[in-house]
Amino acid sequence: AVGVSGAAKRKNALGENVIIQSIGACSGVIVAGAIFTLPALYILQAKYPEMTVTFMQVFISSLLGGVLGILFLIPFRKYFVSDMHGKYPFPEATATTQVLISGEKGGSQAKPLLMAGMIGGLYDFIVATFGWWNENFTTRVCSAGEMLAEKAKLVFKVNTGAAVLGLGYIVGLKYASIICFGSLAVWWIIVPGMSLFFGDSVLNQWNPDITATVGSMSPEQIFSYYAKSIGIGGIAMAGVIGIIKSWSIIRSAVGLAAKEMGGKSDAEKNIIRTQRDLSMKIIAIGSIITLILVVLFFYFDVMQGNLVHTLVAILLVAGISFLFTTVAANAIAIVGTNPVSGMTLMTLILASVVMVAVGLKGPSGMVASLVMGGVVCTALSMAGGFITDLKIGYWLGSTPAKQEAWKFLGTIVSAATVGGVMIILNKTYGFTSGQLAAPQANAMAAVIEPLMSGVGAPWMLYGIGAVLAIVLTLLKVPALAFALGMFIPLELNIPLVVGGAINWYVTTRSKDASLNTERGEKGTLLASGFIAGGALMGVVSAAMRFGGINLVNDAWLNNTLSQLAALIAYALLILYFIKASMKVK
């Protein structure tokens, strides 16, 4: 869009590109929402042939979830985008804004961005497509590290990609450190501790598929089966705490909508263009209509005409989607990563427990809970993604109402596309294993099946995470950032600290504050280039792999030398990042 508008010499190219970016981003958030849950329908259908999964179930759940996400987020736009301006890093929005501005201005700003984009893109493309060096460096590279991992369950990992390094720079050292501390608490305390205290035990009360003792598992397995659930509990409780803290904002947003519905407010007439949202009357009416459509969808399709099940389901979906909208937006504003899968997993667990209590269980209950989870997951994914678009528009002077209106169009097209593609991919490849194995959806299926069969969930682990979030809040430590670190894999958290440390280094080397600021801004340009280049070439590499072009030598990647090569390449990338950021004039 930037290139085409520049070549065509459009007068309002920047504003148009903001709208285009906002529409185009719909596909990513709709896919993220759908792919975490809805493939689980096909996974369970393979075990329960009596289950029916249709295109309309996938399409409607994605569409209605996306629309709800937009409608529920708009009342909170002003708080996250304007009122809290300068208090959240908004890493993804920062990177995209730099790309749009550089495309508009060209010259001195475009050159470092394009150079970093080419370097970061080529770097990540080489790793993903050719495998010249390993994507991750781990302490398993040597025999001592391997023994430490197997005996003590201690392991250190770092993703050596350019995109994640750039993301860490924009997040900054403060939040990156909190996220990393959460990750280290899980990987270096909880995982080894579980092996030490429960080494001879088989903890499978909530997952009968677990047959190994804790001591015989790898650190990664202990994290996946147990420790990650503590992070999920922490995210859920941090979300509840966030809801309580932002209750006045929620109340004022609902109050404003109620006033406008009653025709008692004309405040919108005095609002400047760059702060003008869609009318709260439109939002309220749109929300009611959408929820009615969800009720009809649930009643006639998912719940098979059971009114009680339908009413319970809509209360759960509407309540969780609305309340956790602020959590999704907050997570994106801090670290650029939406913990939507964790929140959706909690939604599925809650939905399953409640639906079983009202008499819906078995395969039909699995379908109902997964479709409910699909609506919630897509709504939260859309809310998190859209707050990024709105922040970009805020920085670049766009009219929020226009972004909001066009977002609905992108949602409709994306939902239809996702539904069709998902059915084709399931029939062609399947989601249970192989090239298109959907790990999050498989996890959802693994959790929901025993719940609907009356087995249970890891409530104790969720409770530990919840208590930890409360303690962190009392200690004035951002609980959501810490819990995100507990949930996100270690190898993705360490690069955030590395990038944040680079940010701190280049902005503190001089006694001249203006020079430090210039260096920081130059680093932001380079980080944005790393993110954009890495993301773009990642898509190209994935398309090649999907098309059957696999040029990676697995034998080489299994060799310890590939990890040493990764460390050298990563060090060179960091050196370039620092040198280029320091060189401002």
What are these regions (language model features)?
Residues 1-585:
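Alpha-helical multipass membrane-protein architecture
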